[in-house]
Swiss-Prot record:
Endonuclease that specifically degrades the RNA of RNA-DNA hybrids. GO terms for biological process: DNA replication, removal of RNA primer. This is Ribonuclease H. Keywords: Endonuclease, Hydrolase, Magnesium, Metal-binding, Nuclease. Binds 1 Mg(2+) ion per subunit. May bind a second metal ion at a regulatory site, or after substrate binding. It comes from Crithidia fasciculata.
Amino acid sequence: MRRVALSVLFQSSRVLHFTDLRDKQIALCNAAPGHTVQFHQHRRHSSAPVSSVGGQNTFSCLGASCAGLLHPSRVRFANRRRSGSTSKKAQVKSSVNQLAIPSAATRERRKPKLSNSCAPAVESQKVGVAPTTSRASGETRTSCAPPPASRMKPSFYVVAVGRQRGIYSTWDQCSEQVKGFSGAVYKSFRTLSEARAYLTAHPARSGLEKSDRGDGAASLSALSEPQVGLRRSRAAEAEASYVVEAPAQPTLRQRVEEEVPSGAAAVQRAESSVPQVVYVDGACSHNGTPKARAGYGGFYGSTSDSRNFSLPVPITEAQTNNRGEMRAVIHCIVQGFVDAGVPPAALGTSHCVEPDWELSELPQPLRRLVIYTDSRYVIDGLTRYALKWVANGFKLASKEPVLNQDLWRQLIRLRDAYNTRYAEQQHWAAATCSHASTRVPAASQSKRFHTHNTRNDETEGIELRHVKGHSNDYGNEMADVLAVAGARMHGTSE
């Protein structure tokens, strides 16, 4: 297809002169009725049925007002032959005089008619509705449908995952919640009902919702009762004032009880649920000295989450930073079991290698657990050395015993039990898609437990992810605050 440029050369009293027309399909014309639009075509060969006058194509304007787009069906071409001996000025004059310009009655008869089914085209253009022309009837029908959503300016911004969930009325307010936020999820909508539906369809996850401070920093002044959670600061109150609407989200247990009546459906619901994300850290003052006091903490992404914890390492055991890191991960795994229906008292016995509560039978499905930690000691121990330690009786290459064996045994057992139960749920869900009464025997998945699986990815029930410590990561900073507070609790208990 030939594409050539269009530009105005000059305008006489009744003739508009243009250069080449793009494929002779449309032209922009501001001529009054009866004016002539003249095109100067540099390329002489054309597939369009247009006559030439001195190498120039001409037609007359027929509409009441030619402002807008002209189609070949609305123009009238002059049947003129090229005259090679006359000058350009003579050619233009000759073409004007010999054009078949229609009469006023003809122009009135050919004038497009407006349909009464909607507002006039002029009014519709004011509200962003473009009129459509029917070639067959000559009528111009205006469409009352709004323009495509992609071209409409959004009025509501939904932050599903960010520093503060909710619906915002301006982009500036929305960007404050998602800019620089890892894993932010947000979307714009034209109507409030669509925004509400999107927010409801994306329930609050345990991912990070930074509602205290925007710079990722944290301080001990934000703590009230570390064992329960963090107190919302005034910055969070001010930030929350921007929210137009943020409906309360049900807990995992409420969603399972209300939305998933059967066991198989509950497993399917858990399979598609958003992973539970938690940041953990350990701290120790005077590490390596007799005055050492260790603590650990965990942050579930929101300062209002009651599962946030800040606890001291028991004074009856070694006070080290590594034991704090290990205890924090153990606490998170046990909390995952508690969320699935294990009695909350299990958190008090999480340090026991053989707890007095059952790991296998759970009334609710386990959620996939993603734990962020800055401890390579814990990650490498579980993913690289656990299988070897279990096989050789927790011995190092130097035949020396592995330190912190009590916590390693408990951590490996809990991790393997969690992964085994989670995998069984996934297989159960797959098996019960067609036969709800059929359940995969637990024995078919017992191999995972006995081999102490060391995989660490999104296919497992528990995934450990490394985060660089003291790198202004909000979740890590908040976990560090809780861990330090836990270490300082030794002074209040002694």
